[in-house]
Amino acid sequence: MLPVAVVALSLLGSASCFAQKPVRVYILSGQSNMVGMGDVTGRSSRWGKQFRDPVVSIYSGKYSPKADYDKLTPVESKKLASIGGTRPTPFPQGGTAVLRGFVKMETDGTYGFNPGYQASSYNIMEVAGQEVYRREPGKQAVRTGFPFTGGKTYPFKVTFLTSQANGLGWVGRTDIPGTLATLVKQDSKFPHLVDKQGQWTVRNDVTYKGVISAVGQGPLTVGLQGNTIGPELQFGHVLGDYHDEPVLLIKASIGNRSLGWDILPPGSKRFTFKDRTYAGYKDTPSSWIEGQPKKKVNWYAGKQYDDYVRAVHGVLDKFGSLFPQYKQQGYQVAGFVWWQGHKDGNPAHAGRYEQNLVRLIKAWRTEFKAPGAPFVLATIGFGGWKMDGPHLTVAKAQLAVSGETGKYPEFKHNVKTVEIRGFWRGVEVSPRNQGYHYNRNAETYMLVGNALGQGMVQLLKNRK
């Protein structure tokens, strides 16, 4: 059971309780899975072939909630060649528009509807007599999923509440296994992520700032990165619960990057593997055969490392203006978080991963003037316990640097690796077949974030 998080700073008391205590800054980095690829919901698509025989009827006068439009005679009715897409058949103008027809989904599941767009989104939609969508002017939309049997046809009706009416709309399955919405709102996991109204909770004591990619900024909540989450979500909850001080998460990450080339830390030397020479820091290209012309590329070993460092410094240098509420308190770099390794799944880079990781840990601490600051990392977990080949070499290298192994005495009590292969979830219980992104299963990202958070707390306690 994950720790139940405190939702809002207001529940802890006023912001004055944090006065004079520096904000605890955690720097998170890696590649695409640190960016965050856990799906929050299933993807919606524009209305299209699911909708059959659409007819729009126009009734006299403005919309009235007392009117029964199924019993009234329309002024005009028009069969529509199509609805949805990007250019639905235009509706006749004037009066109150009611769209009727039939809808069929090919796959069993619960589906959610978003009829209309902008001004035309003020409407009420029913499927088989059950209200699935309602948005009244000046109010937020209320949605209720409808359970479809694949291949079965159901009648639908959309009653528009204003003169703005059209056939635009979106639909998506809401019970896709492995999405955060399904895990939380249907499977009752991670209850601290929703409030009593079923809305995503907001942590006003934990601030997120993304650079390079996943560039949202604001109090920690679901949605800062659009429709995906990374490990920072649960990590932030764990550290927010642990600290009395405010917490700032700075995440510098981007996909398709290797430690052996893109994020190669300063001090890394060239090496030879089989018949090729591999780049040291600032070298280009990534590898070459001695005596042969080098391929010209617009990149160099460690370029992404340099970009990460520059971006994080850009946040810290502007701390007071970016976070004026904490300007007087200042900040302290409290720790580092690392999750990366897929791109190093080749024999040459996998064999150097351990020494590159050791250099990265030392370089990160030196760069941000945080000697001995806790450094927690997660193994890769592709395929779970069935992992083999170069990726297994990478995972073993990640485990080797953990302080408790004793292999690196200077890392004792201040570096910890968490094993996450047990958090792998198969495609049959996940949103997509995308193994390099953990099948986009949000549970994996939550569990990784929790393990990283608990690991960081353990290291922090070691310092006391």
Where are these regions (language model features)?
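Sec/Tat signal peptide C-region and signal peptidase I cleavage site
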Residues: 15-19
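Alpha-helical interaction segments
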Residues: 8, 81, 101-103, 329, ...
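Cell-envelope and extracellular/periplasmic
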Residues: 20-55, 60-64, 166-464
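Bacterial N-terminal signal peptides
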Residues: 3-14
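Extracellular/secretory pathway-exposed regions associated with glycan biology
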Residues: 22-24, 28, 33-36, 46-175
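Positively charged n-region of N-terminal signal peptides that target proteins for export
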Residues: 1-4, 239
